[in-house]
Amino acid sequence: MKICGLLAVLALLAIAGSAKADDLGCISTTFKLLSPNDKVCISDFDDPRVPGVACHISQARKGGWGQPFGLNEDPSNFSVACRQVGPISVDLSKLPENEEAFSQKTSIFFKATRIYRMIDAKRNTLIYVAISSKIINGSPENAISTVPIMPWGGK
């Protein structure tokens, strides 16, 4: 029983550490007469550990009859763009070298798009890498965005 409780706490901590995205909109890429269209959707999120960084993600989403019920597995097609949108005052040396900043389920079972933040201390730059993961195997598809940390408004 203690193990189940510990696993539940660890799962909640893992979920709490990642940012949640807001959907900004979608563009249909195919026409399906009697079911939802395939589309590309744009979402945004703020890095939860680095205030002053915002990212936008475009992801392919599969239409069809499974889509309204969350039964479709979205393809591993995505891109990410992250930018400095305000002052960044976090001490990079206190951040992990590799940490998940965002995760979004892309199927009802075990598949997710994840964005990890890495640090290039030599160049004072944050690196965001998007991947698709599954419990058994993921996809080699990936995307990268870099955020050089610049002075902001005299700070």
Regions found by a protein language model. Name each.
Residues 122-155:
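C-terminal partner/receptor-binding element of secreted or periplasmic proteins
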